[in-house]
Amino acid sequence: MIELGKFTVAQRAMTIAGFAPAMLVGCAVHQSPSSAGYVPVPEYAVRMPVPTPVPTPTPVPPPPPEAPAGLLSTITALESQFDGIVGIAVTSVDDGWSVAANGERRMPQQSVSKLWVAMTVLDYRDQGRLTLDDPYTVTKADLTVFHQPVATLIGENGYPTTIRELLRRALTNSDNTCNDILLRYVGGPDSVRDFIARKQLGAIRFGPGERLLQAGTAGLEWRQEYSIGRAFYQARAALPSAVRLSAFNNYIADPPDGATATAIAQALAQLKRGELLSADSTSWLIATMESSHTGRQRLRGAVPAGWSFGHKTGTGQDFSGRTAGYNDVGILTAPNGKSYTIAVLIGDTSRTIPQRQELMQAVVASVVANHH
């Protein structure tokens, strides 16, 4: 046995501390858990503090650059000084700013609405529901009214063509019959309206198709015989002036194909950014718009050398010196690659055609002057 008396106080404490575990182990070995005085060894859980998660703040995108003040003042003056109802809008595709004058009023689109038909067709193509090489034979039963140059190509067995060619004619020549064929091919007006809604294009309406739209604007009920020759013009001329005036005014006041200049400019910006269609369909549509043969003295008349411009025009019916819709919308791209979308919609005016074109060209000139 160790004699503790020979140890210092510190040594005694260390020795006892060393024996203590062995003594406890001995007790555990020789004493049954059922013995009197048994104290169970508690189980200790180690609890680590859990830090409170700190939420990561959502980054706030910087506001878009301000639009050029000179551009805003110019289009505001152009709109206010023009004799008629006009809406003007310009959007920067790259910088995101927009300017407008009377840009929230719905104006008659007329053939500008062919853009939404074309986009719907190309959206169907992107989904694999059709191809641009799908065949179609145009017959006299397909004819509509007004501008339809494809009518001269229809023979005894019709005119065999493709969806691609119908699209090209509808966009570059504004052929009404080709456009109405495409409209029916994708399921009618509701399919185009669905595309506009799915893509959230805003204040853009799509009308009932060329035949019903033009008949309603004139005050007529559509008949297919109106598609031949000048039958539509003759039927319209036979109407009482009061009937024509009422129908004309009703159309301008609440056009079933009405759209705002702001919505159109922003939709074209989405198209250019590739947000509406596949890359291939986007490129095809913009290239086709750039090869348009219509409206050379509208917006295009002020496009400088070295800039590119793809567009779609729209022209409504005349009555008593007034025109219900004289429009041009498009995508203007500078030599450095920056793009702007422009929409000029003249909903009702008695100004001469050169005066209307001068207004449109002044808008383009201001965009170019404020480009940097």
Locate each region found by the language model.
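Structured C-terminal helix/loop/strand segments within mature extracytoplasmic catalytic/sensor domains
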Residues: 2-5, 28-76, 184, 189, ...
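Hydrophobic membrane-insertion alpha-helices, especially the h-region
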Residues: 18-22
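Active-site-adjacent loops and short helices of periplasmic peptidoglycan-processing enzymes
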Residues: 30-221
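Bacterial N-terminal signal peptides that target proteins for export
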Residues: 3-16
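Carbohydrate-binding/catalytic loop surfaces
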Residues: 159, 220-228, 309-316
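Active-site-proximal helix/loop microenvironment
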Residues: 204-280
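C-terminal motif of bacterial Sec signal peptides marking the signal peptidase cleavage site
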Residues: 24-26
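Short, flexible turn/loop "capping" segments at secondary-structure junctions
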Residues: 171-174, 243-247, 337
